[in-house]
């Protein structure tokens, strides 16, 4: 759907389009160079969601078409994209 973006520690990327209900948006997160990382994402009025990333993982969520904000809250560089 969108991306990829490379997020250094403490950096974020916002305004990412998401699918409207009933479709879910999949957020893919990869730790550049391997290892562990942490990511935070938020859309609309929903609260922040913090997750651990071990190498590479994906999260499927219904963001309701609201724009997504993704923040690297760890100490490793992340590559993020959506589908």
Swiss-Prot record:
Top-level taxonomic group: Eukaryota
Name of protein: Uncharacterized protein DDB_G0269702
Organism listed in the record: Dictyostelium discoideum
